[in-house]
Amino acid sequence: MMSLAWPLFRVTEQAALAAWPQTGCGDKNKIDGLAVTAMRQALNDVAFRGRVVIGEGEIDHAPMLWIGEEVGKGDGPEVDIAVDPIEGTRMVAMGQSNALAVMAFAPRDSLLHAPDMYMKKLVVNRLAAGAIDLSLPLTDNLRNVAKALGKPLDKLRMVTLDKPRLSAAIEEATQLGVKVFALPDGDVAASVLTCWQDNPYDVMYTIGGAPEGVISACAVKALGGDMQAELIDFCQAKGDYTENRQIAEQERKRCKAMGVDVNRVYSLDELVRGNDILFSATGVTGGELVNGIQQTANGVRTQTLLIGGADQTCNIIDSLH
């Protein structure tokens, strides 16, 4: 897989460059469409046989690299792809920080093949690996992580998303004394930062997109962290209303057809088999993980984080275009 590291970095770079000029335009679907087109073109220039096993688009009716789509020149290694052309299209549309173009590669049949739906996610760094169990209440997990890290609960730092669906979790954590950092969007960046050396967070708990979950799992595994995840249907994420039930029923049918289970806890090894993983994230707007795209006197500057699981390397790549 390491031979694909440079092509992968170029793919996320091209998607970010396509989206960036529209920062602040207010139209997240336009931004997604530009990134998807650029990403597809870049993927089709790579000498490999790629297959999108999980991708974003269906939840919010955005453009997409569709699940099952074959990309690449048709020769070379067979590769599973998990993709989110822009994680945080709303943030780009509103001119806000922490938007990324992200993608992960792994050998064929290595990544969880699932619909684009909601996923509950729990991530810790290597020092707390083995201390999480998503089938337990969040409060139990927070206590177990604090114990594994040798920290009192009031020193534990949990990152999540500032979404109504997570308000109960935020309340649970704060009642324990845990310090909660609620981001507007961006759980891929939060997952990586949780596993980062000198990490700002000890644990990540979110309910977000399944594509971002599988992409995050690739980075978490490459960084030696731990993660568990659970697919949940639209009613469980958004509320049990009449208009949501049809979507939830369709999601459950798609899961059955793909051979995955709703409300089953998946371990990190079930999300990502093996360690031959590549993860790439290019900043669109500035954030904690990587810098956003910047206009300079000599051109446009991008910054990309490239993580290799086989050799557990992390590279920050600054490019001038």
UniProtKB/Swiss-Prot annotation:
CDD domains: FBPase_glpX (cd01516). Keywords: Carbohydrate metabolism, Hydrolase, Manganese, Metal-binding. Competitively inhibited by low concentrations of phosphate (IC50 of 1.2 mM) and is also sensitive to Li(+) (IC50 of 15.8 mM). Also inhibited by 1 mM ATP or 50 mM KCl (60% and 20% residual activity, respectively). Slightly activated (40-50%) by the addition of 1 mM dithiothreitol in vitro. Substrate binds at E87, G88, T89, Y118, K163, P164, R165, D185, G186, D187, G209. GO terms for molecular function: fructose 1,6-bisphosphate 1-phosphatase activity; manganese ion binding. The keyword Hydrolase applies. Optimum pH is 7.5-8. It catalyses: beta-D-fructose 1,6-bisphosphate + H2O = beta-D-fructose 6-phosphate + phosphate. The keyword Metal-binding applies. GO terms for biological process: fructose 1,6-bisphosphate metabolic process; gluconeogenesis; glycerol metabolic process. PANTHER family: FRUCTOSE-1,6-BISPHOSPHATASE 1 CLASS 2-RELATED, FRUCTOSE-1,6-BISPHOSPHATASE CLASS 2. Catalyzes the hydrolysis of fructose 1,6-bisphosphate to fructose 6-phosphate. Also displays a low activity toward glucose 1,6-bisphosphate, and no activity against ribulose 1,5-bisphosphate, fructose 2,6-bisphosphate, or fructose 1-phosphate. Homodimer. E.coli K12 also possesses a FBPase class 1 (Fbp), which is the primary FBPase in E.coli and probably represents the main gluconeogenic FBPase. This is Fructose-1,6-bisphosphatase 2 class 2. It comes from Escherichia coli (strain K12).
